[in-house]
């Protein structure tokens, strides 16, 4: 009986740990006219991640913040004086490469993070 209880506790703990990782969501919002962005990590769902990114963008001074992307791995923002790119992927380098590709020439990575 103790063994069965032990296995049940281990299974529950493993499920909770897996669930927390599986539902950690990040999001990016961007305001074109003033080149401000919001970047959020480790939110419980897409709605929370989107709201967090929009709030951060507005708090940074963004006047026309728009939600751009959410992700459950790594996310990156690339910017130049004229362009913006958002990327995501299973690694930081993949997210950054996508952001740079979407942004175009003359862009640099402004922020890049991975869910933990």
Regions found by a protein language model. Name each.
Residues 2-6, 18-116:
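Helix-coil modules at protein/domain termini and other flexible surface or pore-lining loops
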Residues 8-16:
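Bacterial N-terminal signal peptides
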